[in-house]
From Swiss-Prot:
<dbReference type="GO" id="GO:0042026">
    <property type="term" value="P:protein refolding"/>
</dbReference>
<protein>
    <recommendedName>
        <fullName>33 kDa chaperonin</fullName>
    </recommendedName>
</protein>
<dbReference type="GO" id="GO:0044183">
    <property type="term" value="F:protein folding chaperone"/>
</dbReference>
<dbReference type="GO" id="GO:0051082">
    <property type="term" value="F:unfolded protein binding"/>
</dbReference>
<keyword id="KW-1015">Disulfide bond</keyword>
<keyword id="KW-0963">Cytoplasm</keyword>
<keyword id="KW-0862">Zinc</keyword>
<dbReference type="InterPro" id="IPR023212">
    <property type="entry name" value="Hsp33_helix_hairpin_bin_dom_sf"/>
</dbReference>
<keyword id="KW-0143">Chaperone</keyword>
<dbReference type="InterPro" id="IPR000397">
    <property type="entry name" value="Heat_shock_Hsp33"/>
</dbReference>
<dbReference type="InterPro" id="IPR016154">
    <property type="entry name" value="Heat_shock_Hsp33_C"/>
</dbReference>
<keyword id="KW-0676">Redox-active center</keyword>
<comment type="function">
    <text>Redox regulated molecular chaperone. Protects both thermally unfolding and oxidatively damaged proteins from irreversible aggregation. Plays an important role in the bacterial defense system toward oxidative stress.</text>
</comment>
<dbReference type="GO" id="GO:0005737">
    <property type="term" value="C:cytoplasm"/>
</dbReference>
<feature type="disulfide bond" description="Redox-active">
    <location>
        <begin position="258"/>
        <end position="261"/>
    </location>
</feature>
<comment type="similarity">
    <text>Belongs to the HSP33 family.</text>
</comment>
<feature type="disulfide bond" description="Redox-active">
    <location>
        <begin position="225"/>
        <end position="227"/>
    </location>
</feature>
Amino acid sequence: MSKDNLHRYLFENADVRGELVQLEQSYQEILSAHTYPTQIQELLGELMAATSLLTATLKFSGDISVQLQGDGPISLAVINGNNLQQLRGVARWDGELSDGATLQQLFGKGHMVITLTPAKGERYQGVVALDKDSLAACLEEYFTQSEQLPTKISLFANGKQAAGMLLQVLPSEGDHNAEFEHLEQLTATVKAEELFELEAEEVLHRLYHQEEVRLFDPIEVTFSCTCSRERSASAIRTVSKAEIDTIIAEQGKIEMGCEYCNTTYDFDSIDVEAIFSNTQAPETKQ
Protein backbone atom coordinates (compact mmCIF):
# COMPACT_ATOMS: atom_id res chain seq x y z
CA MET A 1 0.00 0.00 0.00
CA SER A 2 1.28 3.45 -0.91
CA LYS A 3 2.64 5.56 1.92
CA ASP A 4 1.45 8.67 0.09
CA ASN A 5 -2.19 9.09 1.06
CA LEU A 6 -4.68 11.69 2.13
CA HIS A 7 -7.27 10.65 4.70
CA ARG A 8 -10.51 12.55 5.32
CA TYR A 9 -12.49 12.11 8.52
CA LEU A 10 -15.53 13.47 10.34
CA PHE A 11 -16.50 13.71 13.98
CA GLU A 12 -19.90 12.08 14.48
CA ASN A 13 -20.83 14.27 17.44
CA ALA A 14 -19.45 17.61 16.23
CA ASP A 15 -19.77 19.71 13.08
CA VAL A 16 -16.04 19.48 12.46
CA ARG A 17 -14.12 17.69 9.73
CA GLY A 18 -10.47 16.75 9.40
CA GLU A 19 -7.82 15.71 6.92
CA LEU A 20 -4.49 13.96 7.39
CA VAL A 21 -1.87 13.57 4.68
CA GLN A 22 1.36 11.53 4.73
CA LEU A 23 3.89 11.84 1.90
CA GLU A 24 7.12 10.07 1.07
CA GLN A 25 7.66 8.87 -2.51
CA SER A 26 5.88 11.79 -4.19
CA TYR A 27 7.82 14.20 -1.95
CA GLN A 28 11.12 12.57 -2.90
CA GLU A 29 10.26 12.77 -6.59
CA ILE A 30 9.77 16.53 -6.31
CA LEU A 31 13.07 16.94 -4.47
CA SER A 32 15.00 14.72 -6.88
CA ALA A 33 14.78 17.20 -9.78
CA HIS A 34 17.13 19.68 -8.06
CA THR A 35 19.76 19.83 -5.31
CA TYR A 36 17.86 21.85 -2.75
CA PRO A 37 19.23 23.19 0.56
CA THR A 38 17.72 21.63 3.68
CA GLN A 39 15.50 24.65 4.35
CA ILE A 40 13.92 24.42 0.90
CA GLN A 41 13.51 20.65 1.15
CA GLU A 42 11.51 21.16 4.32
CA LEU A 43 9.60 24.13 2.92
CA LEU A 44 8.58 22.21 -0.22
CA GLY A 45 7.48 19.30 1.96
CA GLU A 46 5.25 21.54 4.05
CA LEU A 47 3.95 23.26 0.92
CA MET A 48 3.23 19.92 -0.73
CA ALA A 49 1.32 18.66 2.31
CA ALA A 50 -0.57 21.95 2.48
CA THR A 51 -1.55 21.80 -1.19
CA SER A 52 -2.80 18.25 -0.78
CA LEU A 53 -4.93 19.32 2.18
CA LEU A 54 -6.29 22.30 0.25
CA THR A 55 -7.00 20.16 -2.81
CA ALA A 56 -9.17 17.87 -0.72
CA THR A 57 -11.38 20.85 0.17
CA LEU A 58 -12.17 21.55 -3.50
CA LYS A 59 -15.73 20.94 -4.60
CA PHE A 60 -14.89 20.82 -8.31
CA SER A 61 -12.70 19.09 -10.87
CA GLY A 62 -9.78 21.28 -11.79
CA ASP A 63 -6.38 22.62 -10.83
CA ILE A 64 -4.85 24.33 -7.82
CA SER A 65 -1.65 26.30 -7.43
CA VAL A 66 -0.13 27.43 -4.13
CA GLN A 67 2.70 29.86 -4.81
CA LEU A 68 4.97 31.70 -2.38
CA GLN A 69 6.81 34.75 -3.75
CA GLY A 70 9.12 37.25 -2.12
CA ASP A 71 12.17 39.49 -2.36
CA GLY A 72 14.22 37.47 0.13
CA PRO A 73 16.74 34.64 -0.36
CA ILE A 74 13.90 32.42 -1.64
CA SER A 75 12.12 34.15 -4.51
CA LEU A 76 9.66 31.38 -5.39
CA ALA A 77 8.24 28.13 -4.07
CA VAL A 78 5.22 26.61 -5.77
CA ILE A 79 3.22 23.40 -5.75
CA ASN A 80 0.71 22.80 -8.54
CA GLY A 81 -1.90 20.07 -8.37
CA ASN A 82 -5.39 18.95 -9.25
CA ASN A 83 -8.44 17.29 -7.72
CA LEU A 84 -6.88 13.87 -8.42
CA GLN A 85 -4.11 14.65 -5.90
CA GLN A 86 -1.45 14.78 -8.63
CA LEU A 87 1.20 17.27 -7.51
CA ARG A 88 4.41 18.84 -8.82
CA GLY A 89 6.56 21.66 -7.50
CA VAL A 90 9.72 23.72 -7.69
CA ALA A 91 11.59 26.44 -5.79
CA ARG A 92 14.10 29.15 -6.69
CA TRP A 93 16.63 30.72 -4.35
CA ASP A 94 19.83 32.71 -4.33
CA GLY A 95 22.77 32.30 -1.97
CA GLU A 96 23.01 30.51 1.35
CA LEU A 97 20.00 30.18 3.62
CA SER A 98 20.28 30.69 7.37
CA ASP A 99 19.53 27.76 9.65
CA GLY A 100 16.41 28.33 11.70
CA ALA A 101 15.22 31.21 9.51
CA THR A 102 11.52 32.02 9.73
CA LEU A 103 9.22 32.14 6.73
CA GLN A 104 9.46 35.94 6.72
CA GLN A 105 13.25 35.83 6.80
CA LEU A 106 13.37 33.36 3.91
CA PHE A 107 10.99 35.28 1.66
CA GLY A 108 11.44 38.86 2.86
CA LYS A 109 8.47 40.96 1.81
CA GLY A 110 6.35 38.28 0.23
CA HIS A 111 2.91 36.87 -0.35
CA MET A 112 1.13 33.60 -0.97
CA VAL A 113 -1.10 33.26 -4.02
CA ILE A 114 -3.63 30.43 -4.09
CA THR A 115 -5.21 29.94 -7.51
CA LEU A 116 -8.19 27.63 -8.06
CA THR A 117 -8.98 26.83 -11.70
CA PRO A 118 -12.13 24.72 -12.20
CA ALA A 119 -12.46 22.67 -15.38
CA LYS A 120 -15.76 24.52 -15.77
CA GLY A 121 -16.39 27.94 -14.30
CA GLU A 122 -14.40 30.99 -13.30
CA ARG A 123 -10.94 31.00 -11.79
CA TYR A 124 -10.55 32.17 -8.19
CA GLN A 125 -7.41 33.69 -6.72
CA GLY A 126 -6.67 34.54 -3.11
CA VAL A 127 -3.64 36.46 -1.86
CA VAL A 128 -2.26 36.42 1.69
CA ALA A 129 0.81 38.24 3.00
CA LEU A 130 3.69 36.09 4.24
CA ASP A 131 3.73 38.02 7.49
CA LYS A 132 3.55 35.05 9.84
CA ASP A 133 6.41 32.88 11.09
CA SER A 134 5.05 29.67 9.56
CA LEU A 135 3.34 28.49 6.40
CA ALA A 136 0.58 26.89 8.47
CA ALA A 137 -0.27 30.23 10.09
CA CYS A 138 -0.45 31.94 6.69
CA LEU A 139 -2.79 29.24 5.41
CA GLU A 140 -5.03 29.63 8.44
CA GLU A 141 -5.23 33.33 7.61
CA TYR A 142 -6.23 32.41 4.04
CA PHE A 143 -9.13 30.32 5.33
CA THR A 144 -10.17 33.11 7.68
CA GLN A 145 -10.34 35.54 4.75
CA SER A 146 -11.79 33.26 2.07
CA GLU A 147 -14.13 30.87 3.85
CA GLN A 148 -14.51 32.52 7.25
CA LEU A 149 -14.48 29.11 8.89
CA PRO A 150 -12.31 28.34 11.94
CA THR A 151 -9.43 26.24 10.61
CA LYS A 152 -6.36 24.70 12.23
CA ILE A 153 -3.44 23.48 10.10
CA SER A 154 -0.32 21.56 11.17
CA LEU A 155 2.55 20.92 8.74
CA PHE A 156 5.74 18.87 9.09
CA ALA A 157 8.65 17.90 6.80
CA ASN A 158 12.19 16.62 7.34
CA GLY A 159 13.58 16.16 3.83
CA LYS A 160 12.51 12.51 3.72
CA GLN A 161 8.85 12.63 4.67
CA ALA A 162 6.16 15.29 4.83
CA ALA A 163 2.81 15.31 6.59
CA GLY A 164 0.01 17.61 7.59
CA MET A 165 -3.35 17.87 9.29
CA LEU A 166 -6.31 20.16 8.73
CA LEU A 167 -9.19 20.66 11.15
CA GLN A 168 -12.15 22.81 10.11
CA VAL A 169 -15.64 23.70 11.30
CA LEU A 170 -18.34 22.56 8.87
CA PRO A 171 -20.65 25.26 7.50
CA SER A 172 -23.77 25.07 9.65
CA GLU A 173 -26.00 27.12 11.89
CA GLY A 174 -25.09 27.58 15.51
CA ASP A 175 -21.94 28.22 17.51
CA HIS A 176 -19.45 25.37 17.35
CA ASN A 177 -16.46 27.20 18.79
CA ALA A 178 -16.37 25.12 21.98
CA GLU A 179 -16.39 21.85 20.01
CA PHE A 180 -13.73 23.10 17.65
CA GLU A 181 -11.49 24.45 20.41
CA HIS A 182 -11.63 21.10 22.22
CA LEU A 183 -10.70 19.16 19.07
CA GLU A 184 -8.08 21.77 18.16
CA GLN A 185 -6.37 21.24 21.51
CA LEU A 186 -6.29 17.49 20.91
CA THR A 187 -4.95 17.91 17.37
CA ALA A 188 -2.22 20.28 18.55
CA THR A 189 -0.63 17.44 20.53
CA VAL A 190 0.31 15.51 17.38
CA LYS A 191 4.05 15.02 16.88
CA ALA A 192 5.90 14.92 13.58
CA GLU A 193 7.31 11.48 14.43
CA GLU A 194 3.80 10.08 14.84
CA LEU A 195 2.74 11.29 11.41
CA PHE A 196 5.96 10.03 9.82
CA GLU A 197 6.01 6.59 11.46
CA LEU A 198 2.43 5.53 12.24
CA GLU A 199 -0.53 4.57 10.09
CA ALA A 200 -3.23 7.22 9.86
CA GLU A 201 -5.70 5.11 11.85
CA GLU A 202 -3.24 4.86 14.75
CA VAL A 203 -2.55 8.60 14.71
CA LEU A 204 -6.26 9.41 14.82
CA HIS A 205 -6.85 6.89 17.61
CA ARG A 206 -4.07 8.42 19.71
CA LEU A 207 -5.44 11.92 19.20
CA TYR A 208 -9.17 11.28 19.44
CA HIS A 209 -9.60 7.98 21.31
CA GLN A 210 -12.49 9.44 23.31
CA GLU A 211 -14.22 10.83 20.21
CA GLU A 212 -16.37 9.08 17.62
CA VAL A 213 -14.51 9.45 14.32
CA ARG A 214 -15.62 8.33 10.85
CA LEU A 215 -12.61 7.72 8.59
CA PHE A 216 -13.11 7.64 4.82
CA ASP A 217 -11.14 5.61 2.28
CA PRO A 218 -7.65 7.00 1.59
CA ILE A 219 -6.88 8.95 -1.58
CA GLU A 220 -3.47 8.32 -3.12
CA VAL A 221 -1.20 11.34 -3.65
CA THR A 222 1.27 11.17 -6.55
CA PHE A 223 3.92 13.26 -8.25
CA SER A 224 2.81 14.01 -11.80
CA CYS A 225 4.44 16.44 -14.20
CA THR A 226 2.43 17.87 -17.08
CA CYS A 227 5.38 18.57 -19.36
CA SER A 228 5.53 16.89 -22.77
CA ARG A 229 7.32 17.11 -26.08
CA GLU A 230 4.15 18.49 -27.63
CA ARG A 231 3.98 21.35 -25.11
CA SER A 232 7.62 22.17 -25.75
CA ALA A 233 6.97 22.19 -29.51
CA SER A 234 4.06 24.58 -28.95
CA ALA A 235 6.38 26.90 -27.02
CA ILE A 236 8.89 26.86 -29.89
CA ARG A 237 6.09 27.73 -32.30
CA THR A 238 5.50 31.02 -30.43
CA VAL A 239 9.00 32.22 -31.41
CA SER A 240 9.80 33.41 -34.94
CA LYS A 241 11.26 30.74 -37.19
CA ALA A 242 14.15 33.03 -38.10
CA GLU A 243 15.17 33.25 -34.45
CA ILE A 244 14.83 29.49 -34.02
CA ASP A 245 16.92 28.87 -37.15
CA THR A 246 19.65 31.13 -35.75
CA ILE A 247 19.79 29.11 -32.53
CA ILE A 248 19.92 25.85 -34.49
CA ALA A 249 22.76 27.20 -36.64
CA GLU A 250 24.75 28.23 -33.56
CA GLN A 251 24.02 25.31 -31.23
CA GLY A 252 22.92 22.49 -33.52
CA LYS A 253 19.72 21.95 -31.55
CA ILE A 254 17.26 23.54 -29.16
CA GLU A 255 17.00 22.20 -25.63
CA MET A 256 13.71 22.68 -23.78
CA GLY A 257 14.00 21.78 -20.12
CA CYS A 258 11.24 21.21 -17.59
CA GLU A 259 11.91 22.94 -14.29
CA TYR A 260 9.59 20.60 -12.39
CA CYS A 261 10.95 17.17 -13.35
CA ASN A 262 14.27 18.07 -15.02
CA THR A 263 13.35 16.32 -18.27
CA THR A 264 15.00 17.77 -21.40
CA TYR A 265 13.43 17.73 -24.85
CA ASP A 266 15.82 18.18 -27.80
CA PHE A 267 14.77 19.59 -31.18
CA ASP A 268 17.07 19.57 -34.22
CA SER A 269 16.60 21.26 -37.60
CA ILE A 270 14.36 18.46 -38.90
CA ASP A 271 12.16 18.72 -35.80
CA VAL A 272 11.91 22.50 -36.21
CA GLU A 273 10.87 22.20 -39.86
CA ALA A 274 8.17 19.75 -38.80
CA ILE A 275 6.95 22.08 -36.04
CA PHE A 276 6.58 25.07 -38.34
CA SER A 277 4.96 23.03 -41.09
CA ASN A 278 2.40 21.80 -38.50
CA THR A 279 3.48 18.18 -38.71
CA GLN A 280 4.51 16.16 -35.70
CA ALA A 281 8.17 16.33 -34.73
CA PRO A 282 9.95 13.01 -34.26
CA GLU A 283 9.88 11.68 -30.70
CA THR A 284 13.22 12.42 -29.06
CA LYS A 285 13.55 12.69 -25.30
CA GLN A 286 16.63 12.85 -23.12
